[in-house]
Regions:
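Alpha-helical secondary-structure segments
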Residues: 39, 113-120, 148-154, 190-191, ...
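A structural "hinge/loop" feature
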Residues: 44-60, 83-84, 110, 132-133, ...
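Surface-exposed binding/hinge segments that line
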Residues: 99, 133-176
Length: 508
């Protein structure tokens, strides 16, 4: 009633004038309202900012904010242009030419050119760099720069996925004249540039005003806070100390669903956690032991125990629903008698004692460790759990111990998701579980060289069948990626690749 009383007369005219002025100026006000600082919580410390050497999700986040790639993957899994505005391939798929977009600048002002691309690939190919994506780029035999904006790659064999792998995490294009500073003070061509990096505490980024996409990014700054404890993350986002919790601990989901100021944004992925059995160590040098462990694991129960139901059981990193998924292989109940038989054949009729290592700060993987201990009791494998701080886990456990829980993020293609892990020369295989199977090598090489979708699918169906009989480890599920986002954050969408695309995100 009070509002109606003052709707007319002099007061009404004043109100209408003020509203008109506000509407007239909203175009100039809106950008400043949408700018500001986005604060993100992540669980683990970053060891390096050199994209070729990155290995964990927190590092990948910075890769995509600070650096550009020749290509990128959209939310539908399609490869689209980034620094390269277009590309062509010869009929035999052995010669690929990428044409660089004009006006893409590095943060120090120089334009990205063909030699930067060549230098980037050379670093990845160099074993001394230690890049886990090296195996994907070993098929490049020769690189040429016909001019400053053209790069030509000649391959050792036909390969249809070259443009796809240039979208990957470690394949970010780096400036050839700033290589020495990449680990701690990198310069890229992405939407944000590094302001500061304090290991163990935070990464601060600021808008790159000369980013090649007009009007992007909207945010002035991004601050990535390292918060190992899930309780601290929860408190921070609920109070507004941070605006977004990346890769939300699943035990916190129900709590956040009750908060009207927070949105749970989720997306299915092909990201997986795995039970790693290192073939360089006994007893896992015997495939029968690895197979027995796999037979004893209840994957459907693992989804509930480790993920609280926010995932899907699977046999390999090819998720159910993918066109190449082998539907003839069913995910059933554990086969305890079959596992015991294999263990007896391998010389372990009474089972054995083993330590499994789990990383602190990765709660789903810690829950896997607990579940493994219980699931292996019926087959007389007695498991002791050792919890290891994340930094120590990366440096002293991963690839070095016999039995541990690890995890890996979605890759842009099936080939880049599988070949590095299962081929005997795969760069993840040789630093993870040291798996060797000549038949598997032939299958994966055939899939990589396939010229038709039908041929590629045939190879991957065979891959899944062989991985079931001779597993290097156990992949129990693929994960639903979840982020907790305050409602004043606009334009954010979770990525199936689990990176943060903040180019069009704003704060209201």
């Amino acid at each position: 009633m009070m509002a109606n009383k003052f709707a007319g007369g002099e007061m009404g005219r004043v109100i209408r004038l003020v509203v008109a002025l506000l509407l007239a100026s909203i175009g100039s006000v809106q950008p400043s309202m949408a700018a500001g600082t986005l604060k993100v919580a992540v669980p683990s410390n970053l060891n390096t900012l050199d994209p070729a050497k990155t290995k964990i999700g927190e590092e990948y986040i910075v890769n995509f904010l600070v650096f550009g790639g020749l290509t990128e993957i959209d939310r539908n899994g399609k490869t689209i242009p980034d620094i390269a505005e277009r590309w062509t391939a010869s009929d035999d798929l052995k010669t690929w030419t990428f044409y660089l977009r004009k006006g893409v600048k590095f943060h120090h002002g120089r334009e990205v050119d063909a030699q930067d691309v060549i230098t980037t690939v050379q670093r990845i190919q160099d074993k001394a760099t230690g890049s886990v994506t090296r195996v994907n780029f070993e098929l490049i035999d020769k690189m040429e720069a016909p001019d400053s904006r053209t790069v030509r790659f000649t391959l050792k064999a036909p390969y249809a996925g070259l443009a796809d792998i240039f979208s990957d995490r470690q394949a970010r294009i780096v400036p050839r004249d700033r290589l020495d500073s990449l680990a701690r003070a990198p310069i890229g061509s992405g939407p944000f540039k590094l302001k500061s990096f304090t290991p163990g505490d935070r990464v601060e980024l600021e808008k790159f005003a000369d980013y090649y996409v007009p009007g992007v990014p909207v945010l002035d700054q991004v601050i990535i806070r390292i918060m190992p404890e899930s309780a601290a993350q929860a408190a921070a986002v609920e109070t507004g100390e941070v605006d977004l919790v990346w890769n939300l601990p699943l035990e916190s989901v129900d709590q956040f669903k009750k908060n009207p100021n927070i949105v749970i944004d989720s997306v299915p992925t092909s990201t997986w956690d795995g039970i790693i059995m290192n073939g360089a160590h006994k007893p896992f040098d015997d495939s029968r032991v690895r197979h027995a462990v796999a037979m004893a694991i209840d994957k459907k129960a693992m989804v509930e125990l480790a993920l609280f139901g926010y995932g899907t059981p699977t046999n390999t990193m090819i998720p159910p629903g993918h066109p190449y998924y082998n539907n003839d292989i069913k995910i059933g109940a554990p086969d305890v008698s079959g596992a015991k038989k294999l263990l007896a054949e391998a010389g372990y009729p009474n089972g054995f004692d083993i330590t499994i290592y789990t990383p602190v700060g990765r709660p789903t993987r810690e829950r896997i460790g607990l579940a493994v201990r219980e699931m292996l009791k019926p087959v007389n494998i007695r498991v002791d759990i050792q919890r290891v701080p994340w930094d120590k886990f990366i440096n002293e456990i991963e690839g070095k111990q016999a039995f541990y829980v690890d995890g890996f993020y979605s890759r842009p293609t099936i080939d880049s998701s599988i070949y590095p892990w299962y081929h005997s020369n795969g760069s993840w295989n040789t630093t993870l579980w040291n798996y060797k199977n000549a038949d598997m090598d032939r299958i994966l090489e055939s899939a990589r060289a396939a010229r038709t979708d039908a041929d590629q699918k045939s190879s991957y169906l065979k891959f899944q069948a062989l991985a079931l009989e001779d597993p290097p480890g156990v992949i129990p599920y693929v994960i639903n990626h979840m982020n907790a986002v305050r409602k004043n954050v606009k334009g954010f969408q979770s990525s199936p690749m689990m990176w943060l695309d903040l180019r069009k995100v704003s704060i209201q």
